[in-house]
């Protein structure tokens, strides 16, 4: 097979790492959704790997590090960059385009500046620069406040994040109207002059998975009862604010709420209780 060379940037955002590409740098056939694009990202990350190690790729054998991002200048009014996220399976030939990665969202602004997707003349010499991001997977607006020092993205700092060993600069994120479904993606609020937002520290089909957006409580209930075959019934709150999330009482699952990841993933019974399937 002929060799191709594709520029890419490897970045950490929050507690995740991923490989970032400029859309224009991908081969022409991969600049559109489809099998060619997915195949390139799978190979870049080292998937599918039956050994589960991703030795021959940029993935690092965990869901937190088997991620890909495609960035491009935005043609959408009021936005600087379009951000498309793909969760790359480790052992299967599959890229999930159905949602966003909140962690890597913190790296999109700095990466867009590094990649020249934002005019250099707009970047201040010092201070903070707001990068307006269109999150294409879920159709929402994110504003990343990127620290700038001497005209460059400031990467070092004293911000500490649980799960990350070393301190770094903080990139504050604003998720604009994360629970509302509308064509403006949160760029325009129902309250004039006062956009609704949720703040967070840095730390399918594409490009728009319609099922990922909607009301704050998608079922219309504050509390639902989930029936897990062979496990039992659990009281749960289903919330859709940026990414669909299920909240459960730790004690009902046999936890205290202080367990580390290993204590949960080692238990097959508990993993079955956590796993859900949609029709």
Regions found by a protein language model. Name each.
Residues 21-22, 108-110, 247-250:
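Short hydrophobic alpha-helical segments that form membrane-spanning helices or hydrophobic packing faces
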Residues 123-236:
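Glycine-rich, mobile lid/loop segments that gate access to catalytic sites or pores
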Residues 258-260, 277:
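C-terminal catalytic subdomain
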């Amino acid at each position: 097979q002929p060799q191709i060379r594709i520029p890419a940037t490897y970045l950490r955002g929050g507690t995740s790492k991923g490989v970032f590409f400029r859309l224009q740098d991908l081969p022409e056939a991969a600049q559109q959704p489809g099998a060619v694009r997915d195949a390139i990202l799978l190979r870049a990350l080292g998937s599918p790997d039956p050994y589960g190690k991703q030795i021959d790729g940029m993935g690092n054998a965990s869901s937190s590090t088997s991620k890909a991002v495609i960035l491009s200048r935005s043609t959408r009014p009021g936005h600087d960059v379009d951000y498309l996220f793909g969760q790359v399976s480790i052992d299967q030939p599959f890229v999930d385009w159905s949602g966003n990665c909140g962690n890597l969202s913190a790296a999109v602004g700095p990466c867009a500046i590094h990649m020249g997707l934002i005019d250099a003349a707009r970047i201040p010499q010092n201070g903070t620069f707001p990068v307006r991001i269109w999150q294409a997977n879920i159709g929402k607006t994110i504003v990343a406040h990127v620290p700038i020092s001497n005209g460059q993205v400031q990467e070092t700092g004293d911000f500490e994040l649980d799960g990350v060993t070393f301190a770094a600069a903080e990139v504050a994120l604003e998720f604009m109207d994360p629970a509302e479904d509308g064509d403006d993606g949160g760029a325009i609020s129902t309250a004039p002059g006062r956009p609704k937002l949720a703040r967070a520290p840095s730390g399918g089909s594409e490009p728009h998975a319609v099922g990922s957006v909607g009301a704050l409580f998608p079922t219309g209930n504050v509390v639902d009862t989930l029936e897990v075959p062979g496990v039992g019934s659990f009281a749960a709150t289903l919330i859709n604010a940026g990414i669909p999330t299920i909240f459960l009482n730790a004690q009902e699952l046999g936890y205290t709420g202080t367990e580390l990841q290993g204590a949960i993933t080692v238990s097959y019974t508990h993993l079955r209780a956590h796993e859900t399937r949609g029709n």
